Amino acid sequence: MMTDQEIRAAIERREIILDPPDFARIEPASYDVRVGNWAFASSSKEKINLKEKGLLVIDPGEFAVLESRERVELDNKTAAQLGLRSEYARRGLLMLSGPQIDPGFGGILVVRMINLAPKPIAMPYEAPFLTLQFFRLSNPVSKPYSGPQQGQFGISAQDIQELIETEGMTLGQVTKTLGALAKDVAELRGSVGRLSWVLPLIVAVGMAVVGAVVALK
């Protein structure tokens, strides 16, 4: 794993390209990547311009796709590992994307997330939300990365479509449904509780009426 000094030197030699670069975001053994221009949340059904709106709010149980502010490019001797910053993980956010970034990759990072917490989580524009750890290989790879994410410029229509197709009922919708069901059950219990003393009263009144009728005979 590369240290802060090694990361800085690799950026200066352009073995690692982070555009726009910011040396202040270099940590002891990692680099913090920021929230980018666009996002998509399962409840909105459309892309959200974070540069204009300022932040993305991910509701409980909601899925979201975010892109990085930085374009990342690795040479053929450098690999990276991607992870969610601990402050967001502690608050209940879970990253659903693979952590490996292969040598030769170049493009905007696109990650899927879900909020497993009972409260909404805000993702401000340009806030550090991902951390990159870099690894220098002893030799260049023979086959640099050339997969479907190569050269991606951000969230694509395919990213959105895949999220919509795999979403089904979100945890948020499940939570709301269970909440409504719990409310109905509580109301039913209340009704049953009221009947528990109303019914004996009705029976008593009925018996009194019957007794009076019998006495009149």
List each model region and its residues.
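DUTPase catalytic domain/fold
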Residues: 1-199, 212-217
